[in-house]
Design a protein with these regions (language model features):
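Hydrophobic framework residues that shape the active-site pocket
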Residues: 28, 55, 74-75
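Cytosolic regulatory/linker segments at or just downstream of nucleotide-handling modules
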Residues: 128-130, 157-207
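Catalytic-site or vestigial catalytic-site microsegments of nucleotide-handling domains
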Residues: 17-30
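A short glycine-enriched loop-to-beta-strand structural element that forms part of the catalytic core
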Residues: 77, 115-131, 170-171
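Regulatory cytosolic signal-relay segments
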Residues: 1-16, 33
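Alpha-helical scaffold within the catalytic cores of cyclic-nucleotide enzymes
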Residues: 46-64, 80-121, 146-159, 184
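Short beta-strand->loop micro-motif that forms the acidic, two-metal-ion catalytic signature
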Residues: 70-84
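A short pre-motif secondary-structure segment
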Residues: 66-68
Length: 207
């Protein structure tokens, strides 16, 4: 893209409807303590990198763009810089596949005697500003806006919904649900989200 249009290498953004995913390891403290007690910080870094590598491949295979890593948290988005008409579908599909990959990791962790690993993912769809943000000398291609913030809030809310194997691995908003053509959804709850006056209806996929 940059080779075809070098003008994109400048500060500025555009308004666009997109889908956003935030994903985080839940219960990371026991895992961190395990490596700390065994005096193995290198092992912890290797574990995080393995997790990030697995999940990043899924994001990229589904046409997503990894915005940034924040510790063990991944932020990704769809529909920029390359258009993706079914961006909501691909974001939810990514969340489902990441949850499936985590189940494989759980078995590996169990074999190694590690504490169980769970992930929580939140997806939202809405209008944001996307573009190069930063200074004249250093900038990142990123997204900002209320719709982005809601995805992060939803990810944090996954901790409130327990399952037999951990927590609800993926929840998304009605804005995302309304654009899903090939994924069935079930309403999970109506929740109060910081910065929102009205309750937000959240859903999970029927797998």
């Amino acid at each position: 893209i940059l080779q075809k249009d070098p003008s994109k290498l400048k500060l500025g953004g555009e308004r666009k409807e997109m889908s956003f995913l935030f994903m985080d390891i839940v219960g990371f403290t026991p895992i961190s303590e395990y490596y700390k007690n065994n005096d193995d910080p290198e092992g912890l870094v290797a574990l995080i990198n393995d997790y990030l590598n697995r999940m990043t491949k899924i994001v990229l295979n589904n046409g997503g763009c990894v915005d940034k890593y924040m510790g063990d948290c991944i932020m990704a988005f769809w529909n920029a810089p390359i258009d993706c008409p079914n961006h909501a579908e691909m974001a939810v599909k990514t969340g489902i596949e990441c949850a499936e990959e985590t189940e494989k990791l759980k078995k590996i962790f169990k074999e190694k005697g590690l504490p169980p690993i769970n992930i929580g993912s939140g997806v939202n769809t809405g209008t944001c500003i996307v573009g190069n943000m930063g200074s004249d000398t250093r900038f990142d291609y990123s997204v900002i806006g209320d719709a982005v913030n809601l995805a992060a809030r939803l990810e944090a809310s996954t901790r409130n919904y327990k399952t037999e194997t951990g927590i609800e691995p993926l929840i998304y908003s009605s804005y995302t649900k309304d654009q899903l053509k090939n994924i069935k959804s079930v309403e999970l709850d109506k929740i109060k989200v910081k910065g929102k006056d009205e309750l937000v209806t959240i859903y999970k996929p029927v797998i």
